Swiss-Prot record:
Pfam families: DUF1328. This is UPF0391 membrane protein Rru_A0119. Signal peptide: none annotated. Keywords: Cell membrane, Membrane, Transmembrane, Transmembrane helix. NCBIfam families: PRK13682.1-1, PRK13682.1-3, PRK13682.1-4. The keyword Transmembrane helix applies. It is a multi-pass membrane protein.
Amino acid sequence: MLTWALIFLVVAVVAALFGFGGIAGAAASIAQILFFVFLVLLVISLIMHFTRRSRL
């Protein structure tokens, strides 16, 4: 349990450094682009799944 607490502490410190350092704005715009890319890939994957014929 202590290991997880230390891991989350390190992650929080790194996130704070990014947030207070001004890198968060650039990272947020990249994250938005990646979100929409993966959303499109999800929709394509679902369409392919439901239109695929069963090969039994």
